[in-house]
């Protein structure tokens, strides 16, 4: 059963600006996300924009926003196939468990200067 759906869009210029403010990228992104984005070269900001959109979409899918969660405790990594997977640590893992947990599905895309993420949370309890 679907427990929640969230979607978000982020303009890449927002992330480009954050890159000029010391410590801001590190505040919002997990080190693994930053490393993966840097490895993408000129697509770095687009990669981070998609990942930030995923964090926001996850909060919306939870139905609570990102209250009580640190953004860097929610991160996206890609499987070998390229499929994005949301990983939770620390505050995000704890809060998600308090909300009942579930299976998290994520899709990322981009067009021009915009990155979009959709997150679906599937209930693991049968009804």
Which ranges hold each PLM region?
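Core catalytic alpha/beta fold that binds nucleotide/phospho-ligands
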Residues: 1-127
């Amino acid at each position: 059963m679907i427990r929640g759906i969230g979607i978000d869009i982020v303009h890449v210029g927002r992330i480009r600006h954050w890159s000029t403010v010391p410590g801001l990228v590190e505040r919002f992104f997990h080190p693994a996300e930053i490393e993966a984005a840097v490895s993408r070269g000129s697509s770095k900001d687009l990669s981070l924009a998609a990942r930030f959109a995923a964090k926001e979409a996850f909060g919306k899918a939870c139905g609570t926003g990102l209250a009580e969660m640190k953004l860097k405790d929610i991160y996206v990594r890609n499987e070998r196939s390229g499929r994005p997977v949301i990983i939770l640590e620390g505050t995000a893992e704890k809060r998600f468990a308090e909300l009942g947990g579930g299976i998290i599905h994520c899709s990322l895309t981009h067009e021009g200067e915009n990155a979009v993420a959709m997150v679906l949370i599937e209930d693991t309890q049968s009804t």
